[in-house]
Design a protein with these regions (language model features):
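Extended catalytic cores of very large enzyme megasubunits
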Residues: 1-347
């Protein structure tokens, strides 16, 4: 490994060994990963895969390489790179929070066909004696947020108790990294209350859903470093999303910086529609919105012949994987070098 590769390994994938007060070596990281799969591999496969990873000929799921062990046992989602969800239920928001806290990227859609399924919000709000007690865990944060959203839909504004959440900077011994403390979660709770109160008596708009998703991603940090990955799909005709990153949005709606935005084309647009979208992209000075063609993804699925091509596909944040609603994906790599042959790459 060169110096840069060593840095990436030590800072991203090497687990800390408390008993030895150091991080894993590259060999120890691979050993932990191979050992995790137990009897799913025979002895010959273990030897071959270990050598291939060690010599940088292949890379396995890097999410699993990081979390294999107790962390992956506790949160299976942590083994996946990315996912896709349609915002069509109040539960979509807390599910997204949990997935992001596991380090998995999220593609999501706020197209009208999905967000129209959300319920209407109460016409009036009032404070209640209900207290949401937030546990100190990923699933605990997500469940607490689900409770908040549920109460807000019925017009109830609860209190919350985050005293059990470990302070900022505390070591996350199982998952690795440092705790963010309760402050980001409290910020999200307050943001959510304001947003729901502003939508009293109606359904959330696509832009409001988008902002809520971005704010959820904004709180998912480890050691103060952002680690959420998002892509937001919206209707081609949605002018509010088209304008979401125009002007000085970063001063007033900074959470929007957490997501890449793309218009979802369900059929070939007219020349005028296409030109309008590109003009908007240029005028925004942010390079957004991008373009995601659902029609093209359906054609690709049909060409592959491995799944139902009539589904309304979405995508992962990098937009290279076609995904169904609630589907996850993973990435692995074969490193091609000049001395490789077709036979060596196929082994």
């Amino acid at each position: 490994m060169d110096a840069y590769q060593q840095y990436i390994h030590k800072s991203r994938y090497a687990r800390y060994l408390p008993s030895e007060e150091r991080r894993e070596t590259w060999k120890e990281t691979i050993t932990r990963y191979i050992k995790y799969w137990g009897d799913q591999l025979n002895d010959d496969e273990r030897v071959e895969i270990f050598k291939a990873i060690h010599d940088l000929e292949v890379m396995p799921s890097m999410r699993a390489l990081m979390t294999a062990g107790e962390a992956l046992d506790r949160d299976n989602m942590a083994g996946f790179n990315c996912s896709y969800i349609a915002i069509d239920s109040p539960r979509s928001f807390d599910e997204m929070m949990y997935v992001l806290m596991c380090g998995t990227g999220v593609g999501y859609s706020v197209e009208e066909q999905y967000i129209s399924k959300l319920p209407e919000i109460a016409e009036e709000f009032h404070a209640t004696d209900t207290v949401i007690h937030v546990p100190d865990s990923k699933i605990g944060w997500a469940k607490s947020y689900r409770e908040l959203v549920s109460l807000l839909y019925s017009g109830q504004i609860p209190e919350w108790d985050t005293s059990r959440v470990r302070p900022a900077g505390a070591s996350l011994k199982t998952f690795g990294g440092r705790a963010s403390g309760p402050e980001p979660l409290v910020d999200l709770f307050k943001f959510t209350v304001r947003l729901f109160k502003g939508a009293a008596g109606r359904k959330l708009t696509p832009l409001e859903c988008h902002d809520l998703c971005c704010k959820i991603a904004q709180i998912v940090v480890v050691g103060g470093v952002r680690r959420s990955a998002l892509i937001s799909l919206s209707d081609l005709s949605d002018d509010a999303l088209r304008q979401a990153k125009h002007g000085a949005w970063y001063n007033t709606e900074s959470q929007r910086g957490l997501a890449n935005n793309s218009a979802c084309y369900t059929s070939k647009p007219s020349f005028e529609q296409f030109l309008d979208e590109w003009r908007s992209l240029y005028e925004s000075k942010s390079g957004e919105r991008g373009i995601f063609s659902r029609a093209a993804s359906q054609k690709q699925a049909e060409r592959n012949g491995r799944r139902d091509s009539d589904r309304d596909f979405g995508t992962n944040p990098c937009s290279e994987i076609i995904l169904r609603k609630s589907q996850v994906c993973n990435l692995s790599e074969v490193v091609v070098r000049p001395e490789d042959t077709a036979e060596s790459l196929r082994r």
